[in-house]
Amino acid sequence: MKRLEKISSIVPILLRITLNLALIMVGFTLVAFLIREAFTIFNNIFFLDTDVSYYYMTQDILTFFLYFEFIALIVKYFESHFHFPLRYFIYIGITAIIRFIIVDHSSATSTLILSGAILLLVAALFLANTKMLKREG
């Protein structure tokens, strides 16, 4: 019986270590993509080719912010003692929907529905930031 208790106490620790190592690898990968995206934006600003439109540059900037938000989420996970704050997922959702609207705004109905989704996420963010639901220090 004691052996089973010892195994059941070791398994969560091993899983947490595995999760943390995987998140560290994902974080470094995202940093590499963030640097690549920053380099692309820098090249587009200072060495703007006439074939590159501002539409694609805006898309690159929003992709940069998505990478940035995911990196911030991973950093916050380690700072808040292995807990993902809900509001960071909401920020990522809002940014992703805005990027999608910019990329594909051909249908007015879908743009209106996506705008409503952003409004719902902002309301959820407001609720998540109330003192009753906020668990961060």
UniProtKB/Swiss-Prot annotation:
In what way does this protein cross or attach to the membrane? Answer: Multi-pass membrane protein
Principal subcellular localisation of the protein: membrane
GO biological process entries: cellular response to phosphate starvation
Family, similarity comment: Belongs to the PsiE family.
Recorded hits in InterPro entries, A to Z, give: P_starv_induced_PsiE (IPR009315), P_starv_induced_PsiE-like (IPR020948)
Name one cellular component (GO) term: plasma membrane
Task: List the protein's name.
Answer: Protein PsiE homolog
Biological source species: Listeria monocytogenes serovar 1/2a (strain ATCC BAA-679 / EGD-e)
HAMAP family, alphabetically? Answer: PsiE (MF_01048)
